[in-house]
Amino acid sequence: MGIKGLSQVIADHAPSAIKVQEIKAFFGRKVAIDASMCLYQFLIAIRQDGSQMQSEDGETTSHLMGMFYRTIRMIDNGIKPVYVFDGKPPDMKSGELEKRTERRAEAEKALTEAKEKGDAKEAEKFERRLVKVTKQQNEEVKQLLGLMGIPVVEAPCEAEAQCANLVKAGKVYGTATEDMDALTFGSCVLLRHLLAPEAKKIPIKEFHLARVLEEMQLTKDQFIDLCILLGCDYCGTIRGIGPKKAVELIKQHKNIETVLENIDQTKYPPPADWPYKRARELFHEPEVMKCDEVELTWKDPDVEGIVKFMCGEKNFSEDRIRSAMVRMQKSRNAGTQGRIDSFFTVSSQVKCVTVAKRKAQEEAEKMKKGGKKSGPPKKKAK
């Protein structure tokens, strides 16, 4: 789920934090990609006849085709992708996982009813909801990426948190995912729709955390509390408080504790034993690999290994796979020049703290002046 309604909140309250980009804008960038999100997107991309791609043995291969060609498209555009895979879910996510299990059961029931009625459109809708990435599909994609020379990171817990950590350490430019909680975990840059199908021509949305905080006049702590009020994967929300009210309350009261002290809890009842403090801690200190333990190396692809795996084992067309590999090699060679602005790089970590540092300096100046606000310059008497 990520953070419920956060993208719209940012669009409403911090529009300058969002840039609409074409993929070529990221030439020379290293990008950490939420692999699980990608695989899910590839698997729900059902073909016109309502089926997924399969090998001769009846194995689903949509995930391999999607990963292979989308990765090559990124390399064509000078992007150096890093795929980050989910580890075990945090204990606090158990409630959200239970809800997902319930929704799957409801979707299975609805699918059966749609098939009995002969409603193909409804059946397709519920089939998409039942798609789940398997362990085997994860392993096959890791094998393919290894053969392509693309670095893979296996997060101990949430992929978005690990991606955010790589961004904060300056190892990559941004996090590519559809889940907005990458910002809550501290990713300075979030890219949505980077892996959207080229044919759909969906523009990439680039969110900048520093601009969000600056324009909304929030600290990082206040932003995390806002995200918890909006709705995250780790705890419930206060009934009756929507996005507009959540923003108002955080701006007025600064944190959830003070919000709870000042709202009418008969009108806005919080969940019983609401673990918002633990959710806050999880966003502040998620379980991630230390960045000095993560080595990102892009290697030459093993063309024959790819052909053996994709064509020999998974029945893809050898001509198409070899043609795509020729294209990939050309793009790799062309992409070695890098970005001009890399010669003038300020690390992502520095960019993220600039706003907070500037605010602290402004507060210090106010204290020196006795908290007085400077007004407009007085006109000189004629």
Curated annotation (Swiss-Prot):
Lineage of the species this protein comes from: Eukaryota, Metazoa, Ecdysozoa, Nematoda, Chromadorea
Enzyme class: hydrolase
Region feature (Interaction with PCNA): 336-344
Quaternary structure and interacting proteins, as annotated: Interacts with PCNA. Three molecules of crn-1 bind to one PCNA trimer with each molecule binding to one PCNA monomer. PCNA stimulates the nuclease activity without altering cleavage specificity.
Organism whose genome encodes this protein: Caenorhabditis briggsae
Gene: crn-1
TM annotation in the entry: none
Region (I-domain): 122-253
SMART domains, sorted: 53EXOc (SM00475), HhH2 (SM00279), XPGI (SM00484), XPGN (SM00485)
Classification via InterPro entries: 5-3_exonuclease, 5-3_exonuclease_C_sf, Flap_endonuc, HhH2, PIN-like_dom_sf, XPG-I_dom, XPG/Rad2, XPG_CS
Biased composition (Basic and acidic residues): 359-368
Protein name, entry field: Flap endonuclease 1
Binding site for Mg(2+) 2: 179, 181, 233
Region: Disordered, residue numbers: 359-382
